[in-house]
Amino acid sequence: MNVLISNDDGYLAEGIAILARVASEFANVRVVAPERDRSGVSNSLTLDRPLQLKQAQNGFCYVNGTPTDCIHVGQFALPDFKPDVVFSGINRGANMGDDTLYSGTVAAATEAYLMGMPAVAFSLNDASGRYWATAEKALWTLLAHFFKKPPSAPVLWNVNIPAVAPEDVRGIKITRLGRRHHEQNIVPSRNPRGEQIYWIGPVGEVSDREEGTDFGECGAGFITVTPLQIDLTAYPDMAETAAFWHTD
């Protein structure tokens, strides 16, 4: 089985090295990742300039584009390699709740799903670098189970690994997405020339960490797996929307 691996932290990130190393024990792996950190770019594509595919000394390939670009390149530009499955990650930091809308890690998996492949995004609920051992041990468990009977149809799964010691991981839970409050206000500043500039403020606090949510269960020490879908239609609002837009 051929597995394409990407991320949004860039090809030099520790998380993608761990993911590639573990996945290589189960499948034929190729890595195509951004040349630099592209966190928060969501599903964006590079349409205003050409892309370049280069190979690093460690064998990983990198692209001067976004995570979504990398999936396109990995699918259509690698000689003698056609992916059956796509893994994205391991992201340095969680991707839970509405964060998934902004995440390049999740976006790479989403693009693969749209192309008709099973896809899994992996994230570690920690940005300090203290819990990579937990992430690696969790991956062995997750991928051993995955490759026993790989999905035969496209799936899109978002996995978050808790920031606890390896022995303190409590198991796996299937969850729904939680929610955050709206992000905080932008932060005004001045550049060295005295010109007004702005920084996007920090993310908002979690507003929904109830039992059964990714925020709640991952925070309680569980590996969370959340099945995602592409259809954003608000089906319960169809009738109300039709009534609002009804004209005689």
Swiss-Prot record:
**A GO term for molecular function:** 5'-nucleotidase activity
How the cofactor binds, per note? Binds 1 divalent metal cation per subunit.
Q: Which reaction does it catalyse?
A: a ribonucleoside 5'-phosphate + H2O = a ribonucleoside + phosphate
UniProt EC number? 3.1.3.5
User: What residue range is the signal peptide?
Assistant: none
Where in or outside the cell it occurs: the entry states: Cytoplasm
Q: Which cofactor does it need?
A: a divalent metal cation
- Annotated residues that bind a divalent metal cation are located at D8, D9, S39, N91
Top-tier EC class: hydrolase
NCBIfam families linked: PRK00346.1-3 (NF001489), PRK00346.1-4 (NF001490), surE (TIGR00087)
Family designation? Belongs to the SurE nucleotidase family.
Instruction: Write down what this protein is called.
Output: 5'-nucleotidase SurE
Identify the coding gene.
surE
